[in-house]
């Protein structure tokens, strides 16, 4: 019995000796999930679409988000005072500033706001542990911890996600992103040597094996209060915002499939681990320095809410200047809309029959070419619709297993499209893709980097010389759509039935307003761009098509709508397509303004002449922004062609720069109005939308997409270091498509390069929040807002402006559940 008791006693002692595994409390988990949820995604280069980098914080007012980001990471969401000084001298009027003051109910005067622009900014910001340690480090002889942490995490992620991507999934031994990083870092003795810090590796060896244990241990050790965890974690994620955004993209893709992953929490754990290692290392290295660090750290933690409040107060006047700049633009635009309303009321007694209806993407670049095409003849009618033309598809080249989405990033594809081809053509396509894949795989493999240069250097030197003297366009085989008018549409590996095709076609025609009064020729115009040696080329293509050209979408839709069996089925839905009506797929090249029509036998000579003249008109209008307004005709054409094929050209076109408005109305109300390529134009007739379903669709999809585009350009101008990708000339592509580094390291860069925003002398994009004008009853607009939280957050938190545009020209702003007449 005594022996038994002794053994029991021994076991109790052993149990007590076992270290407890740290665990997060429910409050801590909630706070960490909050921080992880604040990061917006960035898409890969081959599917590049514009993203609002503050999307995941849309439920907060933009000024509060701005203050928090400024306090936590020095990221800027509003332009600097120097910018507003220039705007004040050049374009703003006192009445614009006064109106902004009145709107925001601030006790300021125009004079003291002007003085504010001359004051120096002196505001402290949050410092992570690594920043405090760097402040006492001899930077002449030692590398900064901030730089090393960024470099180490970035290089690890580049390698890790390259391997994951090439395999299509994680390996069988994968135990989590944090675990993989920990194993890699423990084996890397070079960090200790590089940083000149003996004993550093031991602290990595002591880190917990799981991300949750690490987070729990570090939060306790660093004495982070539950109330400050979310902001502290957010600050750490902002330290590596590029890779955090990539992880957010992987999360986004999983959620489209109703799945979840823990990558963001693991990524956060990696950054927290570095904080904890440095804290422990300082504690062991120099107790007196550590004590100073501890005092500063805990003091900073205690005043974090006050720090954020200080930044909010400091930025208040800048937001008035921002609002004044937006009022200046809105005032001018609204005068155009009011004048257009007066003109629109002068109804013609007789209108010539429409010979051509051309449906374009709502992209701001389409506004210029649409206006040019309409100017050719009164029998031309254009309309605007989302560039994927309502097709929820992904494109799979014949004879392959690869596919790409052809729809907005907000949506998940449901239909797979494959060209109908002969066996010989399928085989040729497959061989071309396999050759391309092997070449890319060889070039991207780290061990092959130098051997590839040695083996192909002479060939590439010749290629470089050839491209310099005889520039030409190059197309990836997966983007080369074969010359066929037939496509196979499948869903869940089964061909679409006729009823499904009819249902799809009917929905699209109704949404586009093409379910009645059709012309003999209806052009479906997608768009794409042309540039060389441009990692961000997909960003110049159609964002609504997932960063691809719209070619496959318009060709598939034309195929469906020209199908006699589909037309017969549409009759049962009271949609009659006249026998003489032909749908023609076409492409608008936004770089050269040229049109390409597929099936020219359906486009008569008159229409071809209209298209050619419209190209000349649009090209001449755009020449000023390109710095080519000294050229005309053929000389201008040749110059633009050279730009498009020049491998050294960093500004082939200006993309969607200077976008500022989204107008939802019948084209008849805006025809002839020069929006200067700054407005997204979406056709909509509320009288054909009895159940408000079309307006709901527009405000929850295209309006959200335009917000993403608008705020990506806005953010890339406000803070290109954080939300832009820097100097295009210095870009190095990460794993073929993940993103770019600026130079050979640092964080993954997101957003737009400087050359897409600035011409070397001035900004080519004016950073203004999107102004949305909707021709619909106010009650209807308010109902859509009330029923959709995303829309309400965007409007009430001033991520965009929402206006009603009445038939008599009156304009009212909707804000906080009330309509306010706009001056």
Curated annotation (Swiss-Prot):
Its membrane topology: Peripheral membrane protein
Main location: membrane
GO cellular component, as recorded: plasma membrane
GO MF entry, a single one: zinc ion binding
Presence of the UniProt keyword Metal-binding in the record: yes
Activity control summary: Intracellular DIC accumulation is sensitive to CCCP (carbonyl cyanide-m-chlorophenylhydrazone) and DCCD (N,N-dicyclohexylcarbodiimide) and therefore likely driven by either proton potential, ATP, or both.
UniProt keyword annotations, A-Z: Cell inner membrane, Cell membrane, Membrane, Metal-binding, Transport, Zinc
Phenotype upon loss of function: Cells do not grow in low DIC levels, increased carboxysome content. Decreased ability to accumulate and fix DIC under DIC-limiting conditions.
InterPro entries: DabA
Annotated Zn(2+) binding sites: 361, 363, 527, 542
Keyword Zinc carried by entry: yes
Subcellular location: Cell inner membrane
Cofactor(s) this protein requires: Zn(2+)
Organism domain of life: Bacteria
Regulation: induction: Induced by growth in low levels of dissolved inorganic carbon (DIC) (at protein level).
PANTHER family in the record: INORGANIC CARBON TRANSPORTER SUBUNIT DABA-RELATED (PTHR38344:SF1), UPF0753 PROTEIN AQ_863 (PTHR38344)
Function: Part of an energy-coupled inorganic carbon pump. Probably involved in transport of dissolved inorganic carbon (DIC) with upstream gene dabB (Tcr_0853); has been suggested to be a proton-DIC symporter.
UniProt family annotation: Belongs to the inorganic carbon transporter (TC 9.A.2) DabA family.
Self-association state and partner proteins as the record states: Forms a complex with DabB.
Stated name of the protein: Probable inorganic carbon transporter subunit DabA
Gene that this polypeptide is encoded by: dabA
């Amino acid at each position: 019995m005594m022996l038994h008791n002794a053994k029991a006693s021994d076991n109790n002692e052993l149990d007590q000796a076992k270290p407890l595994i740290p665990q997060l409390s429910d409050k801590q988990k909630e706070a960490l999930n909050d921080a992880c949820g604040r990061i917006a995604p960035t898409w890969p280069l081959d599917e590049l679409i514009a993203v609002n980098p503050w999307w995941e914080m849309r439920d907060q007012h933009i000024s509060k988000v701005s203050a928090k980001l400024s306090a936590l990471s020095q990221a800027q969401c509003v332009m600097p005072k120097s910018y507003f000084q220039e705007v004040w001298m050049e374009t703003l009027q006192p009445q614009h500033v006064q109106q902004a003051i009145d709107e925001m109910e601030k006790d300021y005067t125009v004079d003291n706001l002007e003085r504010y622009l001359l004051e120096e900014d002196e505001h402290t910001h949050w410092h992570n542990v690594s920043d405090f340690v760097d402040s006492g480090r001899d930077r002449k002889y030692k590398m900064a911890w901030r730089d090393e942490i960024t470099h180490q995490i970035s290089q690890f992620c580049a390698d890790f996600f390259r391997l994951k991507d090439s395999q299509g999934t994680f390996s069988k031994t994968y135990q989590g992103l944090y675990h993989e990083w920990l194993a890699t870092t423990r084996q890397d003795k070079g960090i200790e040597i590089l940083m000149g810090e003996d004993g550093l590796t031991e602290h990595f060896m002591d880190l917990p094996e799981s991300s949750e244990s690490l987070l729990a241990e570090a939060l306790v050790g660093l004495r982070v209060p539950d109330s400050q965890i979310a902001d502290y974690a957010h600050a750490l994620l902002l330290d590596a915002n590029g890779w955090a955004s990539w992880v957010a993209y992987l999360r986004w893709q999983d959620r489209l499939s109703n799945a979840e992953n823990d990558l963001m929490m693991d990524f956060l754990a990696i950054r927290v681990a570095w904080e904890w290692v440095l804290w422990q290392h300082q504690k062991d290295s120099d107790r007196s320095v550590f004590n100073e660090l501890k005092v500063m750290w805990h003091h900073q933690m205690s005043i974090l809410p006050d720090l954020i409040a200080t930044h909010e107060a400091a930025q208040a006047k800048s937001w008035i200047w921002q609002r004044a700049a937006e009022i200046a633009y809105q005032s001018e635009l609204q005068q155009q809309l009011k004048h257009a309303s007066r003109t629109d009321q002068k109804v013609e007694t007789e209108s010539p029959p429409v010979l051509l209806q051309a449906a374009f993407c709502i992209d701001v670049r389409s506004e210029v070419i649409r206006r040019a095409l309409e100017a050719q003849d009164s029998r031309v009618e254009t309309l605007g619709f989302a560039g994927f033309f309502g097709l929820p598809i992904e494109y799979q080249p014949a004879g392959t297993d690869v596919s790409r989405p052809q729809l907005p990033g907000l949506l998940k594809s449901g239909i797979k499209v494959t060209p109908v081809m002969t066996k010989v053509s399928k085989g040729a396509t497959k061989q071309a893709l396999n050759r391309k894949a092997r070449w890319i795989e060889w070039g991207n493999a780290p061990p092959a980097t130098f051997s590839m240069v040695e083996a192909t250097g002479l060939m590439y030197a010749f290629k470089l010389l050839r491209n310099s003297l005889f520039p030409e366009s190059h197309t990836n085989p997966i983007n080369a759509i074969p010359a066929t008018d037939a496509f196979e549409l499948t869903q869940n590996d089964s061909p679409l039935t006729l009823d499904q095709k009819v249902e799809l076609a009917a929905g699209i025609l109704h949404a586009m307003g093409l379910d009645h009064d059709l012309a003999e020729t209806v052009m479906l115009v997608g768009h794409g761009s042309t540039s060389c040696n441009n990692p961000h080329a997909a960003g110049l293509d159609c964002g609504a098509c997932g960063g691809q050209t719209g070619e496959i979408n318009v060709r598939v839709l034309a195929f469906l709508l020209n199908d006699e069996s589909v037309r017969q089925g549409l009759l049962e839905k009271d949609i009659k397509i006249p026998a003489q009506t032909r749908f023609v797929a076409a492409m608008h090249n936004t770089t050269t303004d040229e049109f390409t029509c597929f099936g020219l036998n359906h486009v008569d000579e008159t229409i071809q002449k209209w298209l050619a003249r419209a190209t000349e008109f649009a090209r001449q209008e755009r020449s000023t922004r390109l710095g080519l307004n000294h050229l005309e005709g053929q000389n201008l054409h040749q110059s633009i062609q050279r730009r498009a094929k020049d491998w050294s050209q960093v500004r082939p076109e200006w993309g969607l720069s200077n976008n500022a408005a989204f107008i939802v109305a019948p084209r008849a109300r805006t025809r002839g109005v020069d929006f200067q390529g700054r407005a997204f134009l979406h056709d909509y007739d509320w009288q054909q939308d009895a159940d408000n379903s079309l307006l709901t669709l527009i405000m929850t999809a295209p309006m959200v997409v335009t917000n993403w585009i608008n705020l990506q350009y806005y953010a890339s101008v406000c803070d290109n270091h954080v939300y832009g990708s820097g100097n295009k000339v210095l870009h190095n592509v990460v794993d073929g498509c993940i993103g770019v580094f600026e130079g050979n390291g640092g964080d993954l860069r997101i957003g737009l390069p400087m050359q897409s925003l600035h011409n070397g002398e001035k900004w080519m994009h004016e950073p203004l929040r999107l102004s949305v004008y909707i021709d619909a009853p106010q009650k209807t607009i308010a109902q859509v807002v009330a029923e959709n939280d995303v829309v309400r957050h965007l409007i009430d938190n001033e991520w965009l402006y929402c206006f009603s545009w009445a038939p008599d020209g009156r304009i009212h702003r909707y804000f906080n559940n009330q309509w306010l007449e706009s001056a």
